[in-house]
Amino acid sequence: MEAVVNSDVFLTSNTGLKSSYTNQTLSLVDEDHIHTSDKSLSCSVCNSLSQIVDDDFISAGARNQRTKPKRAGNDQAQQTTKKDCMVSIDEVASTHDWSTRLRNDGNAIAKYLTTNKYDTSNFTIQDMLNIMNKLNIVRTNRNELFQLLTHVKSTLNNASVSVKCTHPLVLIHSRASPRIGDQLKELDKIYSPSNHHILLSTTRFQSMHFTDMSSSQDLSFIYRKPETNYYIHPILMALFGIKLPALENAYVHGDTYSLIQQLYEFRRVKSYNYMLLVNRLTEDNPIVITGVSDLISTEIQRANMHTMIRKAIMNIRMGIFYCNDDDAVDPHLMKIIHTGCSQVMTDEEQILASILSIVGFRPTLVSVARPINGISYDMKLQAAPYIVVNPMKMITTSDSPISINSKDIYSMAFDGNSGRVVFAPPNIGYGRCSGVTHIDSLGTNVMGSAVHSPVIVNGAMMFYVERRQNKNMFGGECYTGFRSLIDDTPIDVSPEIMLNGIMYRLKSAVCYKLGDQFFDCGSSDIFLKGHYTILFTENGPWMYDPLSVFNPGARNARLMRALKNQYKKLSMDSDDGFYEWLNGDGSVFAASKQQMLMNHVANFDDDLLTMEEAMSMISRHCCILIYAQDYDQYISARHITELF
């Protein structure tokens, strides 16, 4: 019965067709400065471009390739910068036939809306399905529901599927200023066509043969070189150490630099950039980067960060976990300001939100109660990059813990104070928190009652768990020496979630490092010492703990874990006789393994965990949880009818 209620709530939720996107806080383009590859103390964009020039991604024999730019027309209509001007998405996203047919269906729905003078302010998914039935539009792929909705969502005052001309990609497409062309010409000199093409081809080829870190090119992983101090952040490992549906398409197959180039020179994008373009054109809020004062420079810096993350993905999947100071992407991610969130973010939420915002990735569509005029409430569809879980605002007991499972997954609410979607099961007392709106399935505002919030997920679903007890008082402990206190309230995390008839498995988790995770996991230490990641690979849970190479005690713990894993292989998973083996036949193996770890090299098998160990760590220390479909099942396409 609950599934029926959830379906009804979703179908009748307001889709919010009119776009609220506005990007009027920054100027269009810097008229006095063209970004080059020369290092500058006053321009962070030039500094990041200089790192791209100095960086040799991959050595390969390839001739320099030159793209032939299309001549810019003299049509004055293209030079408009009116804030209320609209441009058709169909003009921007001209790709192959498969996407053209999808957009034609979206245009037909939009035309039907305007011809019949529908009130778009109250438009629902049920209305769209009814119109599809009348127009004989049959769409069986479940992902096409997302795509059709994004096309129709931007319909405002006419039959064209539109976005505002304040969006930077539309300004690039319309050549709103001659300085845009000057800047992109300079970029063509900086981005070596050969090197960039090789980087794209390599990461895409890797993606074809990569499942998780157990299928890495080299199972002997290098954590550090003597001259390096930076490492791949555990959040990057959680997102790209396992192939996640939808995110892989946006980050590995899509490319922000080539997207900008194609929009300006050819006024259309190629098929591999199509989903990246749709994600970007339908984002709700722009991002602002500290030290960057105009829209075009922001897009250039976004392209630079996409390229830096792409290189990190390539290294992750080759088993290279260290990086030079210039290659570290974390400092750039920390400079992004998220205009849609009014609350101070912790370091880990900032990094997660920044990585996803670079490609506009918001895989979760939730029907939540939103306040109207401060006196009433309406159910609206809200796209979210991740769901926030705050244990410190939840009242729990041993009999009623915080549970993330198939039953409670429909308990979502909108936090008006921060602008985020939060996980709010009915038993945790969230109703007393300011800004959080609860509404029951009958439409009556009932604070603290069970929430019925239907959820549709495009491939992956992410949770961010707020465990820092004083995140609004202090920040930047990396630079000040201040250590956060961590709330280690246990969470009942289900390894599998059944959502709308589709199985989503726990693929990875980022956890707070409070002590050494082998000897001290049962200690009462509550001070943050860093992060580590647990990936659920085909060979079992695997831990990525980059900070272990900097601490002798942690290295000894890793050595003990590696020796135990080796002994279990030899003794058929038995622990009996381990120390006798270590003092006898295993002494040679122990000496060689110790030498490997001293050289900051480890094999994949060294850091395997049991399922019980992994789930115990995740329960008390997790800060990010990532659920996803199996990649092959996601690709094989499902029906829209299975969503309800």
Curated annotation (Swiss-Prot):
Alphabetical keyword list: Virion
The organism's place on the tree of life at top rank: Viruses
Keyword Cell membrane: no
PTM info: The 73-kDa precursor is cleaved to a mature protein of 60 kDa during virion maturation. Proteolytic cleavage of major core proteins OPG129, OPG136, and OPG098, which occurs at a late stage of core formation, is required for production of infectious mature virions (MV).
GO cellular component terms listed in the entry, alphabetical order: virion component
Residues of the propeptide: 1-61
Subcellular location(s) per record: Virion
Pfam families in UniProt: Pox_P4B
Coiled coil: none
Chain positions covered by the region annotation Disordered: 61-80
Recorded family membership: Belongs to the orthopoxvirus OPG129 family.
Stated role: Major component of the virion core that undergoes proteolytic processing during the immature virion (IV) to mature virion (MV) transition. Essential for the formation of a structurally normal core.
Protein name per the record: Major core protein OPG129
